[in-house]
């Protein structure tokens, strides 16, 4: 034990060389008996500076983890999956940034363009100016003798009804006009008019894939636009009278209207739309949408008391100096169309003054690089813009405002309204991307080009484009051949690409086409087509159009009849292949709502006017009874419903759309009338919101 201790102490006390080097001769290690002591180390040299240690916090432990390391070393330490995820994220962010930059550049460009245009042209909204000579001819006054009406075409089908002037009794304009319109009208009526050349001018024949159309006698077709006489007269003043005898079905429509009006007047007066279940209202534009939409309906139904009350609200409460965005399309067809129609039926210049004021406030929407209007415009500030999520407008929106703007130009003498919308029509006419007359659903307001190419439908976002091709041609005295050609070509495109037959009943329907793939989906909105086809036949288009109209009318009726409530859903799908136990029409749960839409009864009206077949009246009566049974709210009003397949629980949606009064009930009233002179199709053309506007006399 002592030896061990001595060895340990010697090893510790000796120098390093003694400890490592064995004795000479290789003798074993010996126990050190002498301890060698080294002198202490010299003191550190004197320093003339002070060393300061900076603390990195209480937890600093002299670790080097805080020091900078090489980014590349750090990158290499990551796994391959981590590196790939980071690279993917960076690429995605770069792509999003690029898209954002492009979109931002477009918006800045459009903003700069709008600012420049606003400096050049500010909307004139100070009120109605004294009318200048109208740019377009006056409305057509149909011959009182049906035998004297000109023949349109040898192909025109025989109708079982009388033709003649409209039977609506229209009162003269007010004498206390503040804007001098009546005085100007007198001057224009006294002004000399150039006589027409003697002799019967040569009739020009338009032929398009089997449609042979002869213009009205005395017209020529040198250009797309209707020729303008120098100083045509204003619409003649007409006197007010009492409506013709009403049958029980028309009285039924009046009862429904009065119940709906009761709810609106009590719970939503002056607001946009009634919420009948909750006995309240909803706002869209804050402009009394339902009231304006229903003005001409009240006049046609003979409800003079209700009309005068609504007219008083328009006079006292309807002002457009509001900081509010309105949709160009919806506000044009409902508000502008409703005011123009009310003016034509009543002769009250109040409605024309309001219409011009509103039309001026919509004009900033057309200040785009492509002249394709933006979808929304602020009627107070004059700032227009596309939807928040895109720079596109829908084709239906930009091509279904022409009837109203053209008529506003004709009445006021201000060309800008007509010129703006006809630039759009002309632009669409020359665009590529169509398919045998069918157009895509979207168009870019900056580039002016179609987007979402290869998708074609006659449903939402495209429907009224086709309707307005025909109706503009009719409105302008059948002189604008380009419109007729585009319409007829589109109908042929429908036959070629969109028409199919269901199983097992072989119902004819119009589907959709997406990049060459057909879908057996049909919106209820497409039920405007039978009526439009029938209207074309009434004005001289081929009889084959009437055959298609009758087939599609049967389909639209079945879309109502095959539902348990007797009301059509918003969208249906047709079976293309025979399968046991399956019907022609099927409805998905998300599509089984009904919004009180007018398209089916609109087409029933046209089909009855053209054919005289009373089954169309019977079908309309069934639909009216279904509305009364499943949508009526006892306290007042009618509500759209969620489920047309459950008569026990149709589930009211608590909303009465303005078009229920403006369109649905108006078309039902006209359908049940046996008087073809009540808004004769020879004298009036209805806009897509059912507001009648006069047909212009050919120049």
From Swiss-Prot:
- Membrane topology, Lumenal segments: 106-699
Residues of the active site: 330, 463, 570, 599
Kindly indicate whether the keyword Nucleotide-binding belongs to this entry.
no
Annotated transmembrane regions: 85-105
Catalytic activity of the protein: N(4)-(alpha-D-Man-(1->2)-alpha-D-Man-(1->2)-alpha-D-Man-(1->3)-[alpha-D-Man-(1->2)-alpha-D-Man-(1->3)-[alpha-D-Man-(1->2)-alpha-D-Man-(1->6)]-alpha-D-Man-(1->6)]-beta-D-Man-(1->4)-beta-D-GlcNAc-(1->4)-beta-D-GlcNAc)-L-asparaginyl-[protein] (N-glucan mannose isomer 9A1,2,3B1,2,3) + 4 H2O = N(4)-(alpha-D-Man-(1->3)-[alpha-D-Man-(1->3)-[alpha-D-Man-(1->6)]-alpha-D-Man-(1->6)]-beta-D-Man-(1->4)-beta-D-GlcNAc-(1->4)-beta-D-GlcNAc)-L-asparaginyl-[protein] (N-glucan mannose isomer 5A1,2) + 4 beta-D-mannose; N(4)-(alpha-D-Man-(1->2)-alpha-D-Man-(1->2)-alpha-D-Man-(1->3)-[alpha-D-Man-(1->3)-[alpha-D-Man-(1->2)-alpha-D-Man-(1->6)]-alpha-D-Man-(1->6)]-beta-D-Man-(1->4)-beta-D-GlcNAc-(1->4)-beta-D-GlcNAc)-L-asparaginyl-[protein] (N-glucan mannose isomer 8A1,2,3B1,3) + 3 H2O = N(4)-(alpha-D-Man-(1->3)-[alpha-D-Man-(1->3)-[alpha-D-Man-(1->6)]-alpha-D-Man-(1->6)]-beta-D-Man-(1->4)-beta-D-GlcNAc-(1->4)-beta-D-GlcNAc)-L-asparaginyl-[protein] (N-glucan mannose isomer 5A1,2) + 3 beta-D-mannose
Q: List the disulfide bonds.
A: 527-556
Q: Does the keyword Repeat apply?
A: no
Q: What EC identifiers does the entry list?
A: 3.2.1.113
Enzyme class, UniProt record, top EC level: hydrolase
| Stretches for region Disordered | 125-243
Give the record's GO CC terms. Answer: cytoplasmic vesicle; endoplasmic reticulum; endoplasmic reticulum membrane; endoplasmic reticulum quality control compartment; extracellular vesicle; Golgi apparatus; membrane
Principal location: endoplasmic reticulum
Listed InterPro entries: 6hp_glycosidase-like_sf, Glyco_hydro_47, Glycosyl_Hydrolase_47, Seven-hairpin_glycosidases
Cytoplasmic domain ranges by topology:
1-84
Where does this polypeptide localize?
Endoplasmic reticulum membrane
Which biological process annotations from GO are given for this protein? Answer: endoplasmic reticulum mannose trimming; ERAD pathway; mannoprotein catabolic process; oligosaccharide metabolic process; protein alpha-1,2-demannosylation; protein glycosylation; viral protein processing
Q: State its cofactor.
A: Ca(2+)
Task: Report the activity regulation comment.
Answer: Inhibited by both 1-deoxymannojirimycin (dMNJ) and kifunensine.
Its annotated function is as follows: Involved in glycoprotein quality control targeting of misfolded glycoproteins for degradation. It primarily trims a single alpha-1,2-linked mannose residue from Man(9)GlcNAc(2) to produce Man(8)GlcNAc(2), but at high enzyme concentrations, as found in the ER quality control compartment (ERQC), it further trims the carbohydrates to Man(5-6)GlcNAc(2).
Q: Which disease is it linked to?
A: Rafiq syndrome: An autosomal recessive disorder characterized by variably impaired intellectual and motor development, a characteristic facial dysmorphism, truncal obesity, and hypotonia. The facial dysmorphism comprises prominent eyebrows with lateral thinning, downward-slanting palpebral fissures, bulbous tip of the nose, large ears, and a thin upper lip. Behavioral problems, including overeating, verbal and physical aggression, have been reported in some cases. Serum transferrin isoelectric focusing shows a type 2 pattern.
By sequence similarity, the record places it as follows:
Belongs to the glycosyl hydrolase 47 family.
Q: What is this protein called?
A: Endoplasmic reticulum mannosyl-oligosaccharide 1,2-alpha-mannosidase
User: Which species expresses this protein natively?
Assistant: Homo sapiens
The gene is MAN1B1
């Amino acid at each position: 034990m002592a030896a061990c201790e001595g060895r340990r102490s010697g090893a510790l006390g000796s120098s390093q060389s003694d400890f490592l080097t064995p004795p000479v001769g290789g003798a074993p290690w010996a126990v050190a008996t002498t301890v060698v002591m080294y002198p202490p180390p010299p003191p550190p040299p004197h320093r003339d500076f002070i060393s300061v240690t900076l603390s990195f916090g209480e937890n600093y432990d002299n670790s080097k983890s805080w020091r900078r390391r090489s980014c590349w070393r750090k990158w290499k330490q990551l796994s391959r999956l981590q590196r790939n995820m980071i690279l993917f994220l960076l690429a995605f962010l770069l792509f999003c940034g690029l898209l954002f930059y492009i979109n931002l550049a477009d918006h800045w460009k459009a903003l700069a363009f709008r600012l420049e245009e606003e400096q050049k042209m500010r909307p004139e909204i100070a009120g109605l100016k004294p009318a200048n000579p109208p740019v377009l001819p006056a409305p057509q006054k149909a011959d009182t003798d049906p035998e004297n009406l000109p023949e349109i075409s040898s192909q025109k089908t025989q109708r079982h009804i009388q033709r003649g002037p409209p039977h609506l009794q229209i009162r003269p304009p007010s004498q206390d006009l503040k804007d001098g319109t009546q005085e100007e009208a007198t001057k224009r009526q006294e002004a000399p008019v150039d006589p027409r050349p003697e002799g019967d001018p040569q009739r020009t024949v338009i032929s398009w894939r089997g449609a042979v159309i002869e213009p009205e006698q005395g017209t020529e077709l040198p250009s797309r636009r209707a020729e303008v006489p120098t100083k045509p007269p204003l619409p003649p003043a007409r006197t007010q009278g009492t409506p013709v005898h009403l049958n029980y079905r028309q009285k039924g429509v009046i009862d429904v209207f009065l119940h709906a009006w009761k709810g609106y007047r009590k719970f939503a007066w002056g607001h946009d739309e009634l919420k009948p279940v909750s006995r309240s209202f909803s706002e869209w534009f804050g402009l009394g949408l339902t009231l304006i939409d229903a003005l001409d309906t009240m006049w046609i139904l003979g409800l003079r008391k209700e009309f005068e009350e609504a007219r008083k609200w328009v006079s006292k409460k309807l002002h457009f100096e509001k900081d509010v965005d309105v949709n160009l399309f919806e506000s044009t067809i409902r508000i502008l169309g409703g005011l123009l129609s009310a003016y034509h039926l009543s002769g009250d210049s109040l409605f024309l003054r309001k219409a011009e004021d509103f039309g001026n406030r919509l004009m900033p929407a057309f200040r785009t690089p492509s002249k394709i209007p933006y979808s929304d415009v602020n009627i107070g500030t004059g700032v227009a813009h596309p939807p928040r999520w895109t720079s596109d407008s829908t084709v239906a929106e930009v091509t279904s405002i022409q009837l109203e703007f053209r008529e506003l130009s004709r009445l006021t003498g201000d060309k800008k309204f007509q010129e703006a919308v006809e630039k759009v029509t002309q632009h669409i006419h020359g665009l590529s991307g169509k398919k045998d007359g069918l157009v895509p659903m979207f168009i870019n307001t900056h580039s002016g080009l179609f987007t979402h190419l290869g998708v074609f439908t006659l449903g939402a976002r495209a429907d009224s484009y086709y309707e307005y091709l025909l109706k503009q041609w009719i409105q302008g005295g059948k002189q604008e051949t380009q419109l007729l050609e585009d319409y007829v070509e589109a109908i042929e495109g429908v036959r070629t690409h969109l028409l199919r037959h269901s199983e097992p009943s072989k119902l004819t329907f119009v589907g959709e086409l997406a990049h060459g793939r057909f879908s057996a989906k049909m919106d209820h909105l497409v039920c405007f087509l039978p009526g439009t086809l029938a209207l074309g036949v009434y004005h001289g288009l081929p009889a084959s159009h009437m055959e298609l109209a009758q087939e599609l009318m049967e389909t639209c009726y079945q879309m109502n009849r095959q539902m348990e409530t007797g009301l059509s859903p918003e969208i249906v799908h047709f079976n293309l292949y025979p399968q046991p136990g399956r019907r022609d029409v099927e409805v998905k749960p998300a599509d089984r709502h009904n919004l009180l839409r007018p398209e089916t009864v609109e087409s029933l009206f046209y089909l009855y006017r053209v054919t005289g077949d009373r089954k169309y009246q019977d079908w309309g009566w069934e639909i009216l009874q279904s509305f009364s049974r499943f949508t009526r709210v006892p306290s007042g009003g009618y509500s759209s419903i969620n489920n047309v397949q459950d008569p026990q629980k149709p589930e009211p949606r608590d909303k009465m759309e303005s078009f229920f009064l403006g369109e649905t009930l108006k078309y039902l009233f006209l359908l049940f009338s046996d008087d073809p002179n009540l808004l004769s199709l020879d004298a009036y053309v209805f806009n897509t919101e059912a507001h009648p506007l006069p047909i212009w006399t050919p120049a």
